[in-house]
């Protein structure tokens, strides 16, 4: 019975590692409060913001805005490009819109005011599956040196998820050694 306590502790620890690295992330649009408004720093401000993040299924994006002057419309790609605010769209007018990214693909959001959308108040978010992890090969061949990558200001969630999986795998292997 004494040997089952360490095994139980390892199982609990490995489950904690797995769960803690698979949680979703909440993103505040523009990384600041009340940023869904005009004027924008540039017409491509939200495009740059979105490209600096890696969105996965289950993540949430939060639009904070003045609901007396703004709204958020979820639209298709054509209406996104043309800034069409009329039609079959999901419209949000609450000033604190939370959207769960529940499927893989591209989500398109525009301001409910066409003039604001034309000024750049629109956002396209590419969502990937968080379970698309690439496992490293068991045997690696030396790679020729490559140029240094440019610095990246945002973190990479995929690396954290991969690290969590590798840690879980290592703990599982240690547990198996105790069971055999």
Swiss-Prot record:
Disulfide bonds join 83-117. It is found in: Symbiosome; Cell membrane. Pfam families: Cu_bind_like. Residues 1-22 form the signal peptide. A lipid is attached at residue 154 (GPI-anchor amidated serine). Expressed in developing nodules upon symbiosis with Sinorhizobium meliloti. This is Early nodulin-16. It comes from Medicago truncatula (Barrel medic).
